Design a protein with these regions (language model features):
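Aromatic- and acid-rich polysaccharide-binding/catalytic face
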Residues: 62, 215-249, 301-303
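Loop/turn elements at helix/coil->beta-strand transitions in domains of secreted/extracellular proteins
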Residues: 31-35, 57-60, 88-93, 154-160, ...
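Boundary/entry segment of secreted carbohydrate-active catalytic domains
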Residues: 2-53, 58-65, 365-371
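Acidic (Asp/Glu)-rich catalytic clusters
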Residues: 27-28, 49-57, 77-90, 149-156, ...
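Substrate-binding cleft of extracellular glycoside hydrolase catalytic domains
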Residues: 71-193, 200, 204
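Aromatic-lined carbohydrate-recognition surfaces of secreted/lumenal glycan-active proteins
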Residues: 35-39, 162-164, 191-217, 270-283
Length: 375
């Protein structure tokens, strides 16, 4: 079938009015503005307090994770947070999946992991081979994730879903097998398994698909994803806006290159897909984006001390009002004010009023304001 980047690849999504409302918004801003996003760590939401304290505003989108939806320890906290964010504040939701599987498929009580280095006996090849224990685990987990997405669907929440992220590297178990091969058929099979199971078996209508393979060997057909993303973390002593802009500009070109391989799968010149900086460690400079025409659909800065000043043990350094400060190595209040105030960036306050969500600030922010003001 013809590749049409102006419509969601999901036939089910095209029939969901709320999903199409969000889709049409994404298409309308792409190439004109960039949506701000941050990855959430937990319900404490200290990252929110950093941005709100500096600007009175929040990112337009938040990133969540199905990391606790499978494995030995399970929790629906991330699902609850996403639903509240969408319905209370009208914010957009992105989901990735740090997919925990048994470290040893023959010993499920031996713990779960998603890092390749921690897994001793879970074959990626078996994961896409019917009749194996790994295959049964994979199908079980996909079906479990489907129940979480179905719950959000029933609440009117659309998600930008980014499974099998950073697959071009070997640090996650779903990463490349046989890097020197022309294609990595195992990855492609796993991607299509997830897509087919959620689209055709569960018939979910609230998914906008994000491919984040970021390697020629993970190229997939463009009719199985809507957005192409790249995760890149700048790591250099020169942290000037100019240096970071130069780095992100090269990342944009790199992603365009990856997209050409997906176009080749379909036998076309280009996919026309929207491009995103799906993970990063520094907020990009809006003026740098404008000057270099690297118009990401959105950028998503990671959580924790990528945003707040660390205080030890993974927690932020708090003042007497329990307010975290920006990590001075990466952010400042002035930078947040300037970037959020730039008309290129879409923040929560700049989003339109969607039919699926409210316009209230999160309860965590209200509680913080109450105590800060002596309540």
């Amino acid at each position: 079938k013809e590749v049409d980047a102006t419509k969601p690849v999901s036939e089910n999504a095209r029939k969901n009015e709320k999903t199409m409302e969000e889709w049409n918004y994404l298409r309308s801003v792409y190439g004109k503005q960039v949506i701000t996003c941050q990855q959430m760590m937990d319900s404490e939401a200290y990252e929110d307090l950093v941005f709100y304290n500096a600007s009175g505003d929040l990112t337009a989108m938040k990133g969540f994770d199905f990391i606790f939806s499978t494995g030995s320890y399970t929790s629906d906290d991330m699902i609850d947070m996403a639903i509240e964010w969408s319905k209370t504040s009208g914010g957009l939701c992105a989901f990735t999946w740090h997919w925990n599987v048994p470290k040893d498929i023959d010993n499920p009580s031996g713990g779960y992991a998603f890092y390749t280095s921690e897994i001793t006996n879970f074959s990626q090849i078996n994961a896409v081979t019917p009749g194996t224990k790994e295959y049964e685990t994979v199908i079980h987990d996909i079906d479990l994730i489907a129940t979480k997405i179905q719950r959000m669907e029933s609440e009117g929440v659309t998600i930008l879903f980014r499974p099998l992220h950073e697959a071009g590297n070997a640090w996650f178990w779903w990463g490349l097998q046989g890097r020197d091969s022309a294609t990595n058929e195992v990855f492609q099979k796993l991607w299509y398994m997830i897509y087919d199971r959620l689209e055709n078996y569960h018939k979910l209508s609230n998914i906008i698909w994000v491919w984040n393979g970021q390697n020629p060997h993970t190229a997939i057909h463009p009719n199985s994803y809507d957005i192409a993303g790249i995760d890149r973390y700048y790591d250099n002593e020169d942290t000037s806006a100019e240096a970071i802009t130069k780095y992100y500009t090269s990342c944009y070109s790199e992603l365009q290159g990856f997209e050409k391989y997906c176009a080749e799968v379909a036998g076309i010149e280009e996919t026309g897909k929207m491009l995103t900086l799906s993970e990063c460690g520094y907020m990009p400079d809006p003026e740098g984006i404008r000057a270099n025409n690297t118009m990401w659909l959105y950028y998503m800065i990671w959580n924790g001390d990528f945003i707040y000043e660390p205080g030890g043990g993974g927690s932020p350094l708090l003042d007497l009002d329990s307010t975290p400060s920006p990590n001075p190595k990466r952010l400042s209040n002035e930078m947040i004010q300037n970037y959020f105030g730039n008309d290129l960036f879409v923040t929560l306050n700049k989003l339109p009023e969607f039919s699926f969500g409210g316009r209230d600030i999160p309860q965590k922010i209200k509680n913080w304001e109450f105590y800060k003001n002596g309540g």
